[in-house]
Amino acid sequence: MITEIMKQVEIFTDGSCLGNPGPGGYGIVMRYKGTEKTFSEGFNKTTNNRMEMLAAVVALRKLKEPCSVILTTDSQYVRQGITQWIHGWKKRDWKKADKKPVVNADLWKQLDAESERHKIDWRWVKGHAGHRENEMCDELARTAAENPTQDDTGYPG
C-alpha cells in the first residue's frame, strides 16, 4: 500500500499597519526543502489584524496541494482565533458569545477554508524579538504598508 506523503512547508507571516486603521501590508516567508520565497502586498486602508490574517490566507492559498505546514505568526489574534475561538463562532453562525458579529468574519471564513486543505501546526513567536523569519516578514510588511497599491475590499471603513 502506497501512502501519499504530504510536503513539509514552513510559513512565517506578519502584518503591519501605519495608523490602525491606515495603510497596511503583509509579509510572508515560505520555506520548502531549504528554498525560501517571500511575498508582500500593501493596502491603502486596513487594520493590523486584517493584515495578520491576510498574510496567513495568502500564504496557504499559494500551496498548490495539501501540505503539512508549520505556520508561525506573532499574532495571538490569528493563532487563537483559528485554533480556539473559531469553533464557537461557526456554531453561532459567525457571532461572538455576546451575539455581536465576529469582526473580520470575511477573512476568518477564508482562513478557515484554506486551513481545511492542510495539516497545520499553528505556532506563535514574540514579535520584534530577533526571530530571523519574523523580522524578515516584519520588514516586508512595513515596506508594503509604506507603498500601498491595493484596496482592502473587506474593510468597512
Curated annotation (Swiss-Prot):
Assembly and interaction partners: Monomer.
InterPro entries: RNase_H (IPR050092), RNaseH-like_sf (IPR012337), RNaseH_domain (IPR002156), RNaseH_sf (IPR036397), RNaseHI (IPR022892)
Residue span, RNase H type-1 domain: 5-146
GO cellular component, one term: cytoplasm
Cofactor annotation remark: Binds 1 Mg(2+) ion per subunit. May bind a second metal ion at a regulatory site, or after substrate binding.
Residues that coordinate or bind Mg(2+) 2: 14, 138
Family: Belongs to the RNase H family.
Catalytic activity of the protein: Endonucleolytic cleavage to 5'-phosphomonoester
Chain residues that bind Mg(2+) 1: 14, 52, 74
GO MF, one annotated term: nucleic acid binding
Localization per record: Cytoplasm
Biological role: Endonuclease that specifically degrades the RNA of RNA-DNA hybrids.
Keywords, alphabetical: Cytoplasm, Endonuclease, Hydrolase, Magnesium, Metal-binding, Nuclease
Entry-linked NCBIfam families: PRK00203.1
UniProt cross-references to PROSITE patterns, sorted A to Z: RNASE_H_1
Main location: cytoplasm
Uppermost EC category: hydrolase
Cofactor(s), by name: Mg(2+)
Listed GO biological process terms: DNA replication, removal of RNA primer
Protein name per its UniProtKB record: Ribonuclease H
EC assignment: 3.1.26.4
